[in-house]
Amino acid sequence: MPLSYQHFRKLLLLDDGTEVGPLEEELPRLADEDLNRRVAEDLNLGNLNVSIPWTHKVGNFTGLYSSTVPIFNQEWQTPSFPKIHLHEDIINRCQQFVGPLNVNEKRRLKLIMPARFYPNSTKYLPLDKGIKPYYPGHVVNHYFQARHYLHTLWKAGILYKRETTRSASFCGSPYSWEQELHHGRSVTKTSQRHGDESFCSQPSGILSRSSVGPCIRSQLKQPRLGLQPHQGPLATSQSGRSGSIWARVHPSTRRSSGVEPSGSGHIDYSASSSSSCLHQSAVRKTAYSHLSTSKRQSSSGHAVEFHKVPPNSARSQSQGPVFSCWWLQFRNSQPCSEYCLSHLVNLLEDWGPCADHGEHHIRIPRTPARVTGGVFLVDKNPHNTAESRLVVDFSQFSRGSTRVSWPKFAVPNLQSLTNLLSSNLSWLSLDVSAAFYHIPLHPAAMPHLLIGSSGLSRYVARLSSNSRIHNHQYGTLQNLHDSCSRQLYVSLMLLYKTYGRKLHLYSHPIILGFRKIPMGVGLSPFLLAQFTSAICSVVRRAFPHCLAFSYMDDVVLGAKSVQHLESLYTAVTNFLLSLGIHLNPNKTKRWGYSLNFMGYIIGSWGSLPQDHIVQKLKHCFRKLPVNRPIDWKVCQRIVGLLGFAAPFTQCGYPALMPLYACIQARQAFTFSPTYKAFLSKQYMNLYPVARQRPGLCQVFADATPTGWGLAIGHQRMRGTFVAPLPIHTAELLAACFARSRSGATLIGTDNSVVLSRKYTSFPWLLGCTANWILRGTSFVYVPSALNPADDPSRGRLGLYRPLLRLPYRPTTGRTSLYAVSPSVPSHLPDRVHFASPLHVAWRPP
């Protein structure tokens, strides 16, 4: 007869009311392999090979072979990004605020000023892969929305735009390392390899300064990077030298309007083997006529003023030689049908420039006209579907033999968090807007983190049925109109209402590199965690009576009273703003005395999962089918949810071990009614995880494979096992006996497995029961030689070792508390004293 739920509870000793024998007899039984096997068979836990078809969906959890169709929202708003500029002298500013920084804080702040990224190898992908065809039904809309998002990021100073192979432009305030690379500031060595005068960049991408003779100086003034107008004498003297960049480009391309490879003006790259890979001129717009008034430092140190190009030669680009640009070609062509794009292009006289250029130009290491990752848009988060979020896929750096092993960093575990944050403080949490985009990246990383798009014409051609990318006879009118279709015309007409003349700008190819850290690289979470933990450490030192703590971009502040918290909030906000950190004041949340953080509610009583997680648990058990094999992928998702709440249940993680085993074996799992009832009962009653208190250890446990011994104060006890047990199992049993005999929450043991409080590797029934008995117990390590319970466990009761005075201090784990806050008094004062922390600790920044 299968094991009923009541019997199973009795077996696990979970029922308080039932009469069971003494624990010393009952517990070792649960370690018996035979019993564990019989129970597993009864509960159908071990039977992984099933012939019935697997279930692939349980509630909201989907498993193998299921494809969730992403939903595209035509109304998505592109979020706005503030002009984020983290101040470069952040260390000095912190030191003015709080005095000298300690080593940990300095090291962390230096890591991010600027951040560096050097992958082992980088795979370059064609531009067509820049915007992923994630929404096959909304290709054009997705293209323009993604392109608009990229443009917004570039305008906000988050991206560099590749102008030529070796130069980039950006918006926003430049950092000092960018000013060193500013065009014309530093004179570069010329490498004489192959008679080429290309920039020789050092590994870091910073170009060396050196005093160069006047002859080279005069050559450097020539427009090698297209940053000066091509005027007669310079341009002609240039074409004689074979090595220079401009000599490689067909002379016809040297015009003042932008060069467009995907248009028809077929460019002949004489020196390059594959013309398809050189879209460089796409981003190498030689037209800098809009820069005509800006002054630039020349290499010789004199300011060179851009000469104004005579008005007739600098016609507005949209009226200039039209054959340079796919979009403007439609203006002079005969409409091919009522859905021809020429109808749209003729709506506007002036479509604006073909390319936008940033406020600043810098030199960069050689950057090919390629991308290294694709982008697509999704909902900003499950609660905000009105705004979009850009997903950047740089997964190439985490794959294959050349993958980058990302640095590891400490994530606070539940017990550490509770020890640290469980107190009766008032709490509020701050919202850092676009946290990742605060941290600047060195320009040398740009060639590895490239995103972009190949331009609308190629994008549409690639997705239409017969790919016309391979026939290079651009420019014939028939080819131009190949892309006209009703669908494209209707989409563009609707988009014209949204974007207006920007449609022209967005239809051009573009290559962008990251100037701030992107989210799709494993380095970014590490850097963000280092950054916010260092800042919080500074805040804790500045306000010693308060607590500041962060995990990634989630920053919380705690203070003893609401008034104190408000003044702290004002001071900290001003401090963070002075560093250039952007906070979103609308999203500041005041929590009162129970803080919501990282999915937990943390109050003076301890921590529990937040309510939405409790609701998910209830929903999960309502939908969980019985006696049907569930595919292991679904099990993985169920275990993810149950694992989060496991520390709050009686039996903890050990209860989930059968599920873990089936996931590891990649087999289906069948819930028997008893196992489901057991789990659901476990998760319906959640117990808070309390904070650990410091104290003196008075109770010690020790065991040998054949016997156990306890030292409780001056009392000694011993016992033997019926059969020899593995040593870890014996030690665990001894710890359980110590807890049940003495009721002490602090036990000394010399076994590392018991100390770790992970009971998942023990026999299943014993692990579940031991977790319940030892819940809330803290363990102190005591070396075997000093353990007072060592002798009793070996059967020697007469010998007395002196009782140790073992103090126990609860740990906050590796959560970076470099500045340890003084402990907060546990009671609230009846009234504010005049020596209140408001008057004493709060110094204006």
Curated annotation (Swiss-Prot):
Its EC number is 2.7.7.7, 2.7.7.49, 3.1.26.4. It comes from the Viruses. Residues 359-602 form the Reverse transcriptase domain. Residues 349-692 are annotated as: Polymerase/reverse transcriptase domain (RT). SUPFAM superfamilies: DNA/RNA polymerases. Mg(2+) binds at residues 431, 553-554. One of its GO terms (biological process) is DNA replication. Pfam families: DNA_pol_viral_C, DNA_pol_viral_N, RVT_1. Activated by host HSP70 and HSP40 in vitro to be able to bind the epsilon loop of the pgRNA. Because deletion of the RNase H region renders the protein partly chaperone-independent, the chaperones may be needed indirectly to relieve occlusion of the RNA-binding site by this domain. Inhibited by several reverse-transcriptase inhibitors: Lamivudine, Adefovir and Entecavir. Residues 1-179 are annotated as: Terminal protein domain (TP). PROSITE patterns: RT_POL. Residues 289-301 have a biased composition (Polar residues). One of its GO terms (molecular function) is DNA-directed DNA polymerase activity. Residues 180-348 are annotated as: Spacer. PANTHER family: PEPTIDASE A2 DOMAIN-CONTAINING PROTEIN-RELATED, POL PROTEIN. Belongs to the hepadnaviridae P protein family. Multifunctional enzyme that converts the viral RNA genome into dsDNA in viral cytoplasmic capsids. This enzyme displays a DNA polymerase activity that can copy either DNA or RNA templates, and a ribonuclease H (RNase H) activity that cleaves the RNA strand of RNA-DNA heteroduplexes in a partially processive 3'- to 5'-endonucleasic mode. Neo-synthesized pregenomic RNA (pgRNA) are encapsidated together with the P protein, and reverse-transcribed inside the nucleocapsid. This is Protein P. It comes from Hepatitis B virus genotype A3 (isolate Cameroon/CMR711/1994).
